[in-house]
Amino acid sequence: MAPKAEKKPAEKKPVEEKSKAEKAPAEKKPKAGKKLPKEAGAGGDKKKKMKKKSVETYKIYIFKVLKQVHPDIGISSKAMGIMNSFINDIFEKLASESSKLARYNKKPTITSREIQTAVRLVLPGELAKHAVSEGTKAVTKFTSS
């Protein structure tokens, strides 16, 4: 019985499609044509302003630091993109490392101590020392003001 049941719907569908196509192509197509433009027109009346997706970058800060260090040197947009990607990568590494440190110590909060330890672990040698001193200076300036 299963093969018969499978054959019957297959036979009926083409017959129904043919009968629908033969009986009312002139009637149904204009109605559908009329409905679609009205719906599209109604959607067109409610024009919503497309907001430009804001992308946060470090480009302005990179440029400011560049001008502090070398005022006469510029940077290409491709190099700026690379620097922005580099900073995002470093911050992501620092965040994950400080998160691990907080978890190891069973603390719910990432403090400046976890960040400082993460900097020492992620950055190599002399760079870590300079980063820690600059970070300490920035935190002191922030808390004093």
Swiss-Prot record:
Record's comment on post-translational modification: Can be acetylated to form H2BK6ac, H2BK11ac, H2BK22ac, H2BK27ac H2BK33ac and H2BK34ac. Mono-, di- or trimethylated at the N-terminus to form H2BA1me1/2/3. H2BA1me2 and H2BA1me3 may be methylated and/or acetylated to form H2BA1me2K3me1, H2BA1me2K3me1K6ac, H2BA1me2K6ac H2BA1me3K6ac, H2BA1me3K6acK11ac and H2BA1me2K3me1K6acK11ac.
Modified residues (N6-methyllysine): K4
Subcellular localization: Nucleus; Chromosome
Modified residues (N6,N6-dimethyllysine): K13
Modified residues (N6-acetyllysine): K7, K12, K23, K28, K34, K35
GO molecular function: DNA binding; protein heterodimerization activity; structural constituent of chromatin
Protein keywords: Acetylation, Chromosome, DNA-binding, Isopeptide bond, Methylation, Nucleosome core, Nucleus, Ubl conjugation
Main location: nucleus
Cross-link (Glycyl lysine isopeptide (Lys-Gly) (interchain with G-Cter in ubiquitin)): K141
Gene Ontology CC terms, in alphabetical order: cytosol; nucleosome; nucleus; plasmodesma
Subunit: The nucleosome is a histone octamer containing two molecules each of H2A, H2B, H3 and H4 assembled in one H3-H4 heterotetramer and two H2A-H2B heterodimers. The octamer wraps approximately 147 bp of DNA.
Family membership: Belongs to the histone H2B family.
UniProt protein name: Histone H2B.7
Organism: Arabidopsis thaliana (Mouse-ear cress)
